[in-house]
Amino acid sequence: VATFGLSIVIQNALIEGFSADVRSLEVGRLATASVNLGAGIDLPLVGILGLGTAIAVIGGMQVFLSRSRTGRMMRAASDDVETAALTGANARHIYAVATAIAFSTLALAGILLGTRSSFSPTAGTLILIFAFEAVVIGGLGSLWGTLLGGLILGLTQSAVAYYDPAQAILAGHVVFLAVLAFRPQGLIPARSV
């Protein structure tokens, strides 16, 4: 709920500061570069770079959260701040690190999105819905599940768009609802500790 409220404030601030015009990032020939897999299948290089970046970031986060002292403290504080404080976790420091990681990841995601498509201050709501659906499809609390959920959502929308572009977003929502109905914990639920 706080994220939706914050997104409305940010959206209106961007409209006031920069206008509501649609924009895109210039990436030169990278925008049209692709890798031919044969059989008439071409994958855009920007998409491959985005997937590779996502895998690297998620892998790095997984290692950070499971192997570093700060990462373990972050996980503990997300479960119970008072108990984490008893073990020496400084809640303000943990929240500051978590916020820095979140904003850094957000900036990287924004750059990757800007290289693939145009954007405007009002585009965030739809992207936020897709992100929410990817997290739920993959499983709350599972980093790799979120990646899988995003891939399933994106591939479903792309496959349906090939046949009927008007139904692509609806198809993604149907997959989301099907996962909620048949596997509400997600495809890769987080392990309970």
Name every feature range the model reports, one short phrase each.
Residues 3, 78, 130:
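Conserved catalytic core of two-component sensor histidine kinases
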Residues 40-119, 143-149:
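Helix-loop-helix "hairpin" substructures at the membrane interface of multi-pass membrane proteins
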Residues 1-67, 94-97, 159, 171, ...:
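Transmembrane helix-bundle core of multi-pass membrane transporters
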Residues 100-106, 110-176, 181:
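Transmembrane alpha-helical segments in multi-pass inner-membrane proteins
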Residues 79, 90, 141-142, 165, ...:
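A helix-boundary/kink motif common to multi-pass secondary transporters
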Residues 9, 83-84, 136, 152, ...:
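Hydrophobic/aromatic residues within transmembrane alpha-helices
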Residues 16-19, 77, 107, 181:
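Conserved catalytic core of Hanks-type protein kinase domains
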